Amino acid sequence: MSAKAEHYDVIRKPIITEKATMTSENGAVVFEVAIDSNKPQIKEAVEALFGVKVKAVNTTITKGKVKRFRGQLGKRKDVKKAYVTLEAGNTIDVSTGL
């Protein structure tokens, strides 16, 4: 499967945190994805961009916090994360560029 332009719109960036590193030991990778993307779109994009087989996709939406900026109230954007579990034998090196 070849990568299309819309696949790059679905996957925004990999998330590299302590929790994401711990899940990578179990064969999962964490990505920030477009807020309007769904699980089949995420699965198709990861398989096309990285050439791996996806076993499961779990998503979470983190609501943006209300913050004060120069005396004005503002809101950070909502973030959607996708926990992508890979089939056995497949790996993704997230330290390389997309």
UniProtKB/Swiss-Prot annotation:
GO terms for molecular function: rRNA binding; structural constituent of ribosome. This is Large ribosomal subunit protein uL23. Belongs to the universal ribosomal protein uL23 family. Gene3D superfamilies: 3.30.70.330. The gene is rplW. One of the early assembly proteins it binds 23S rRNA. One of the proteins that surrounds the polypeptide exit tunnel on the outside of the ribosome. Forms the main docking site for trigger factor binding to the ribosome. Pfam families: Ribosomal_L23. NCBIfam families: PRK05738.1-3, PRK05738.1-5, PRK05738.2-4. Keywords: Ribonucleoprotein, Ribosomal protein, RNA-binding, rRNA-binding. GO terms for cellular component: ribonucleoprotein complex; ribosome. InterPro entries: Nucleotide-bd_a/b_plait_sf (IPR012677), Ribosomal_uL23-like (IPR013025), Ribosomal_uL23/eL15/eS24_sf (IPR012678). One of its GO terms (biological process) is translation. Part of the 50S ribosomal subunit. Contacts protein L29, and trigger factor when it is bound to the ribosome.
